[in-house]
Amino acid sequence: MIQRFSFGHPFPTQSVVLSLPAESGPIPFLTPDGSGWQLTLSEQAAVYGLGEMPRGINKRGWHYIANNTDESRHSEDKLSFYGAHNFLLVRDGSTCFGLFVDFPGKVYYDIGYSRHDLLSFHTETPDYDLYLLSGGNENAICREFRTLIGRSYIPPRWAFGLAQSRWGYKTEEDVREVARQYKEHDLPLDMICMDIEYMQDYADFTVNKERFPDLTKLSADLKAQGIRLVPIIDAGVRVDPNDSTCTEGLEKGYFCKKADGTPFVAAVWPGKAYFADFLRPEVREWFGHKYKALTDCGIEGFWNDMNEPSLFYSPERLRAFLNDMAALREKDNIEQEEFFPRVVGGAMGLMNSPADYASFYHEVDGQKVRHDQVHNLYGGSMTRAAGEAFTDLRPGQRTLLYSRSSFIGSHRYGGIWLGDNNSSWAQLLANIQMMPSVQMCGFLYSGADLCGFSSDTTPDLALRWLEFGLLTPLMRNHSAVGTRMQEYYRFPEVLPAVRNMIRLRYALLPYLYSEFMKAALENTSYFRPLAFDYPDDPDAREVEDQLLLGEGLMAAPVYVQNAHGRHVYLPEPMKLLRLRAVDDYDEEILPAGHHYIRCALDEMLLFLRPGHIVPVAQPANNTSELDDASLTLWSFLPDGESAEYRMYRDDGVTTEYEKKEHWKTLQIHHS
């Protein structure tokens, strides 16, 4: 059951697709708490959700702010990351319910932080819709929520192959060399992602003709090898009288404005930039169709970045800071009381300043709306602009699209990656724990920067992260300029194991793709915590580092440096697969309970649940070469029992998802 409660004058976020009447009266489970709400938690209660947020799967014990932020330090003390995903699921004894706070500005959550037995939340202004979902278990409530917010984005099938990316591929030859090296080292590859270096002066929808003289030919040459080019698009439009996107946006009045009606300006990668007012339908249509400059070159996929929006500085704030520094110029000794707040704090405060976010406006139905009041909609609205345009630019075809910033609702138009993480073992664990949370909120096509984006990775971290990343829908190796090059062929000491693991990803695609399509078409889960399927098992409720994957698998990644095994909890008997390659593994049936399982660096652990089948193909160099007509069936069946598996296989490129012939039933009988 879904109930909607409305307060004040909610902003139309368009997060939901169902129109429900507002109810009055008390809200079940909640009591008023000043301007917000609270509920008492028992000692055993668990709270799930909030999507892209720090900390574990169970969010209890910390406080959070839904406030899309360009946060480069992904540490446990942070309160916000790139997405605002205001869905919570509470399990307390036999009580289970979900809450969705539909509000475009800041939402503050205290989940057992100030008081361990109390959950409270409030919005920045008193205008919001609150949805209560009840009457089922965790999986049923998540399914109901996904019905409320609409079908998740479905990418092309080739987007489930490996993507190699780096901020630092500066020329066409750099890109071609990556493709050559992957082929030379016999490593499968489906995508090469291009960062801002392909652009002319970092301006959207342009190509630097000196560095990339013929993007159309480059795209065609790579596509002939089964590899797609995936370029980046940033939110800021370069201030340049010779740039058509800039001049058209100015002429049409399509950029966000300050209070005096002049366009808001802030600096990002191209220097001074304007920002499209994505909350206006006509602006979304205009900006989205700008992608045509690249789809005409044969490009079939994009990633949107810097769209919180990230602001390096505004000219006004930079000028004030420099004037303040000039006042300190003649001082021989700057006391720490001045140095830290004025110099360090002043410099750090230039970027993503709350004052800047409060200084420009959107136009909504002819009315001015201050940006900070609807801030969390911006990145998702950019995704929507592109997603809607692709239906015109590439009719009937799927286009790959994923974004850094997001809001519930934008999951219908694209996926997400989990932002600028770092190369650390802690970030590998964070990746594991964040996946079920973002997928609860509809972002099925999601993944982290494998190996880590910032700082230098190591061969063992690269391999262990791959052993989990090969299970995530978006499987992308991405890193920052100035860090160690981390293409998978650069680790000779672990290269055979890396090759086996990438090939294992491709072999598992009949299962992984089927489970993704079930989740998208039937509003079920791809990743989920053990607690969702075993709610009455107190040990399962406390597992934070194992995930159920679709119907039949459980993953237990190794995420500790130098570890050669790990503890695993099995809520029921399962078949262990200790995999070194798709055709090289040990299997063992283990009873329910706690186990310590050895796992060498070149091995990964998967567990087959009883009564289930996992179809496995022969590995391929890319998804277009994958032959899933001849399959091996992994299974865990008691003697004399049989099982079925619904496998999904379509053309992988058109939007005709729902044809019955896409489904094939596989059967096995264990005699």
Where on the chain are the PLM-derived regions?
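Extracellular structured ligand-interaction cores
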Residues: 82-86, 94-96, 104, 127, ...
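Catalytic core of carbohydrate-active enzymes
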Residues: 75, 377, 383-399, 405-416, ...
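A residue-level signal for conserved active-site and pocket-lining positions in enzyme catalytic cores
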Residues: 87, 145, 182, 222, ...
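Short, hydrophobic/amphipathic alpha-helical packing segments
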Residues: 64-65, 81-84, 176, 284, ...
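Catalytic and substrate-binding clefts that recognize carbohydrates or anionic sugar/phosphate headgroups
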Residues: 1-159, 166-167, 172, 179-184, ...
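A conserved hydrophobic secondary-structure block that centers on an alpha-helix together
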Residues: 77-78, 152-155, 165-219
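Aromatic- and carboxylate-enriched substrate-binding clefts and catalytic-loop regions
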Residues: 188-498, 534
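Glycine-rich, histidine-containing beta strand-loop boundary motifs that form or position
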Residues: 31, 41, 91, 100-103, ...
